Amino acid sequence: MGREYDGLSLPAAVPGIHHVTSITGDVQRNVDFYVGALGLRFVKKSINQDVPDTYHIYFGDYLGTPGTAMTFFGWPSWPKRRAGSGQVTTVGFTIPEGSFEFWVKRLRDLHIESSRATRFDGDVITIHDPDGIELDLVTGSSALKLTPWPDGPVPNEHAIHGFHSVTLTVAEAQASVDFLTKTMGFRQKAQDGRRTRFETGGGGPDSILDLVESPEGPAGEESIGTVHHVAWRAPDDKHQADWREKLIAAGRNVTPVIDRWYFKSIYYREPGGVLFEIATDSPGFTIDEKPGALGSGLSLPPWFQVRRDTLGETLTPIVIPTNLVQGRASSR
């Protein structure tokens, strides 16, 4: 599942992105966009375990493989988008080489505004999701071992191939640079003005972090249309425990290990204020649903099962798009 590990590089460096979690104000609209427009599979309908009367939903490849999982907290009562420093401000997805014009046309046909650019010698399409989160579609060749969604609205040869990168915006970059390179094992690869590119693990898509210094910008706040955190991969509990020790030794305030049922997590902030997580690859989303049924029902960890009836009445129903024809999807 995901990249193969040589067993020698951890905890010297995290191998890549595990998942990215953001905040949406309209879960149904969010599902319509990420499934119907971007062609990601809806792989899990669960709850935010810290605010259990709200959704935590997950998108990805057919299995939600680590390195593909874009997830959202459904918090409609939260304030609207307040993006700024101390946040992940852009999420990058990988699209296959040769798919650039396909995506330009697809987005135009779906009436989604986009812009085109070249960054570090790569072609980039920039769009925004319905809540305003900035997304990059970047051409590249990913080493992630994915399971394609055969029934998705995007042909497999053009489908999103997991994450490409995350962009962090910070008020002052040097402390973040030192932490990324000296503690987390990132390597600096390129620089363009205030943007510095780093990579980790085997390099390439799903391992890239761009750091943008913005001393004059406003501080970001947790709000609808912002990224809550980015999670980095650990192949197992042992590697995660090693990382926790290393981070504490580096002066980070790290949470205890938290069992999220689909993975185990530790959380901490890098010096620029961005919330990081290290999440285990296992057990994955098929722990409580078969692959073909992923996302079809409300999935709850065992310790929340006693609240299933109450939560089922509290949570607004989600309709998964099924009319996936000619690049369009409808849940209506």
Predicted feature residues:
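Vicinal oxygen chelate
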Residues: 1-11, 15-25, 46, 76-171, 192-210, ...
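Short beta-strand/turn micro-motifs at beta-sheet edges
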Residues: 6-9, 78-81, 152-155, 214-221
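Peripheral, non-catalytic segments flanking oxidoreductase cores
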Residues: 2-7, 69, 73-82, 140-141, ...
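Conserved donor-binding loop and adjoining core beta-sheet/short helix segment
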Residues: 44-49, 59-93
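Core segments of cupin and vicinal oxygen chelate
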Residues: 23-66, 109, 115-117, 121-128, ...
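A structural feature that tracks compact, well-ordered secondary-structure segments
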Residues: 60, 73, 137-138, 168-169, ...
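A compositional/structural signature marking long, glycine- and acidic/polar-rich segments
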Residues: 198-258
